[in-house]
Amino acid sequence: MVPGPNTLFVLKNSVSSGMKGGYLAACGVFIGDAVLMFLAWAGVATLIKTTPILFNIVRYLGAFYLLYLESKILYATLKGKNNEAKSDEPQYGAIFKRALILSLTNPKAILFYVSFFVQFIDVNAPHTGISFFILATTLELVSFCYLSFLIISGAFVTQYIRTKKKLAKVGNSLIGLMFVGFAARLATLQS
């Protein structure tokens, strides 16, 4: 697992909104990844990878969405309040939705799944769907374990940060800057 925007988003939400916020973000990532894996298996991801205009649309949507998320983080940091407050239940739905969109607009994930499944699934073998399902389930379980570790770690960090307001602002600012970096890298990504 290479930390990227999805990982950072889950970690940020586990720190700012507790374990519930972290797991809602993780669920958005899991569902988004499952959709991308299915698209890779169905051949749609290959079409996106080999069609420059489609790849560029996904790439720029992803970059703009990362910048949007960064602006929300920066705004909340400057205002001195948490973007996803624990007492505000409707924000939990926003966490899930943002994670899902973030996952679906990640062309690096599309490229990964296309190249990953090709290595392990023989398209000429019978029952490729079963092989795909087993491999996709394994990937999701590994992702669940990895993100659970981050969520639990984030919950512990939250206890420390609550007493250090300045540290929390610096942390949010750094996360925002990392999203800008991810957006710039995504905008310059080649298929």
From Swiss-Prot:
Listed GO MF terms: antiporter activity; L-leucine transmembrane transporter activity
Places the protein is found: Cell inner membrane
Keyword Endoplasmic reticulum in annotation: no
InterPro entries cross-referenced by the UniProt entry: LeuE-type
Presence of keyword Transmembrane: yes
Catalytic activity: L-leucine(in) + H(+)(out) = L-leucine(out) + H(+)(in)
Keywords annotated in UniProt: Amino-acid transport, Antiport, Cell inner membrane, Cell membrane, Membrane, Transmembrane, Transmembrane helix, Transport
Assigned GO CC terms: plasma membrane
Membrane-related topology note: Multi-pass membrane protein
Listed GO biological process terms: L-leucine transport
Entry's transmembrane regions: 28-48, 50-70, 101-121, 132-152, 167-187
Family: Belongs to the Rht family.
NCBIfam families linked: PRK10958.1 (NF008201)
Protein function: Exporter of leucine.
Protein name: Putative leucine efflux protein
Gene symbol of the encoding locus: leuE
